[in-house]
Amino acid sequence: MQIGGMALRDGVLLQSEKYWAAAIREADGSVRVSSGAKAHLPGAETVRQVPLVRGVARLAESLAVLPAVRRATGAPVLPQEDPRMLAATAASAAATLALRSTRRGSPVLKELAVAGVSLAPLLLLLRDSRLARYHGAEHKSIAAYESGREPAEAEKEHARCGSNLIAPIVLTSLGTNLALRALGREREPLATLVAGLVSLGAAMELFSWMARHQDHPLAKTLRLPGIELQRAFTTSEPTPDQLEVADAALSELLRLEEAFPEHARA
């Protein structure tokens, strides 16, 4: 079973294909666990067979869980609800828009600049933060499940972290933007939207290939920027209390998989 997840403001969210489980450290020190079944897009089984579309669909299904997590916890636990995170995201979006609006410079350098400028505020905010430690706890709990090791012994960087999408997205965005320029349609909103969706779909395909071939030299090369970002900015070594929270989320997810095997195979 493949498990994904994300750090919450005071906890961890883990997901399998069919279920989600979140564990939150309450103000009184207790751990609150919430869980449920994931909603799937209509025709999900068919969509999962379509290249370029399937990765985006899986991403959408993962993000669709967040409102349910918010309702279940009854507190502002999502990272996006932190005012500082909102400000950093707004700054990133503004800088990205400004860079993409200019026609000066090499397309390659522009994509690299967009990647750097769009990430910089978020990375500075995350570095050595509580969220980064919970991110590390999330990775360690998943790695421990996959390898059979103790969470404390597992690495805080993980091969399937969304950070590792950076290189695929830069490459696919460069390709679609060059295509738009060649066609003279880089200023058309609809063409830009379609190119963006194609770029994201292609990046997700490449990301999935990297996850299936983790020891391939190309996969290791493409993963390197994301791993280094995890090491330096987006993850920190968690405390034992934070590992306890991540373990609670993992235990609940595994309980659901064991308790409802028919649903898990549906």
Description of each model-found segment:
Residues 1-266:
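Short amphipathic, positively biased membrane-proximal segments
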